[in-house]
């Protein structure tokens, strides 16, 4: 179920403060965040945000096509390494 249009998109306050601060200075530093639930808004375009995936922070460059999505969508948490090989030698 999607979020109601009557409500504003969720963006963590600390993340919003950091982005507004960088926009006023016109700087492009990497912003480190653990807030995967924050929605990408147009003021974030052009910034690089390092999103936590449970183990490390993955730097993601925000483009205009990402607006409206959540930050966590671009930082995968699981690493699928494939199914186990059929090892007949260990069965004997």
UniProtKB/Swiss-Prot annotation:
Cell compartment(s), UniProt: Plastid, Chloroplast
Entry-linked InterPro entries: Ribosomal_uS19, Ribosomal_uS19_bac-type, Ribosomal_uS19_CS, Ribosomal_uS19_SF
Keyword list, A-Z: Chloroplast, Plastid, Ribonucleoprotein, Ribosomal protein, RNA-binding, rRNA-binding
GO MF assignments: rRNA binding; structural constituent of ribosome
HAMAP family reported for this sequence: Ribosomal_uS19
Function of the protein: Protein S19 forms a complex with S13 that binds strongly to the 16S ribosomal RNA.
Similarity comment: family membership: Belongs to the universal ribosomal protein uS19 family.
Protein name as catalogued: Small ribosomal subunit protein uS19c
Annotated organism of origin: Glycine max (Soybean)
Gene that specifies this protein: rps19
């Amino acid at each position: 179920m999607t979020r109601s249009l009557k409500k504003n998109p969720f963006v963590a306050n600390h993340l919003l403060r950091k982005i507004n601060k960088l926009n006023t200075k016109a700087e492009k530093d990497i912003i480190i965040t653990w807030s995967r639930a924050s929605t990408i808004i147009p003021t974030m375009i052009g910034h690089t945000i390092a999103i936590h995936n449970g183990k490390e922070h993955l730097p993601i460059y925000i483009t205009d096509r990402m607006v409206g999505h959540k930050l966590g969508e671009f930082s995968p948490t699981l690493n699928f390494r494939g199914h186990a090989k059929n090892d007949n030698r260990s069965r004997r």
